[in-house]
A protein has these predicted regions:
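Solvent-exposed, non-transmembrane regions of membrane-associated and secreted proteins
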Residues: 6-217
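Short, Lys/Arg-rich, polar N-terminal cytosolic tail immediately upstream
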Residues: 1-2
Length: 217
């Protein structure tokens, strides 16, 4: 009887240790899995872009330009290549994430969302694209490190086969109702938005960039 009780207690201790280790590793493992999923989605997007004919690509660009200028083009079809319309790369904070054409909670838990009614991410003077992402998730970093960016840093949007490079010009923390995304005729802008402080989420961190020449061009 004592032998069985001893074995039972030993089993319980092992179980507690296994559960504890699992809980400790869960955020790291989940983050790794989500990052791999994002990489796979971006690879699929690039493959789909490479298979587009020039006519198809031109039509998509024209539809996106029409939407940006007038809002008349079908938003969900303008850059439709599956769920992803572009992807963002921010080397300084190790961000490499797909961009979806919605800002639902489901999307923002795994990727970056494009804010409807703002310019689609194709660039051009008089455009202002707004991208939103969560911060502080235990399973996915997303825009958690956005506050580490400084004025002068750059980020890149990859849309179709174009690389749109933006240099950070302003960083501000404001109330949600004060977030603005007006277009300026002579500027090509993109703003990255996330909630702050992490876990409180009463304000918005807005990192705005202006388009600069891509050194690879």
């Amino acid at each position: 009887m004592k032998s069985k009780l001893k074995k039972y207690k030993k089993f319980l201790w092992i179980l507690v240790i296994v559960i504890g280790i699992s809980l400790l590793l869960f955020p790291t493992v989940s983050s790794f899995v989500n990052r791999q999923k994002s990489n796979d989605e971006i690879d699929s997007y690039n493959k789909a872009v490479s298979e587009l004919t020039d006519d198809n690509k031109n039509n998509m660009e024209q539809n996106a330009e029409k939407y940006n200028q007038t809002g008349d083009s079908n938003y969900y079809n303008a850059l439709n290549l599956g769920e992803i319309i572009s992807y963002i790369e921010i080397p300084k904070i190790n961000v490499y994430l797909p961009i979806y054409n919605d800002t639902s909670e489901k999307t923002l838990s795994v990727a970056i969302g494009h804010l409807e009614k703002t310019s689609l991410p194709i660039g051009g003077k008089g455009t202002h694209c707004v991208l939103t992402g969560h911060s502080g998730l235990t399973t996915n970093k997303l825009f958690t490190d956005l506050d580490k960016l400084s004025v002068g840093d750059t980020f890149t949007l990859h849309t179709l086969d174009e690389k749109l490079v933006y240099k950070v010009t302003t960083i501000e923390i404001i109330l949600p109702e004060d977030v603005y995304y007006n277009c300026e005729l002579d500027k090509d802008q993109c703003t990255l938005v996330t909630c702050t402080p992490i876990g409180v989420n009463t304000h918005r961190l807005c990192v705005r960039g202006e388009r600069v020449l891509n050194n690879e061009d």
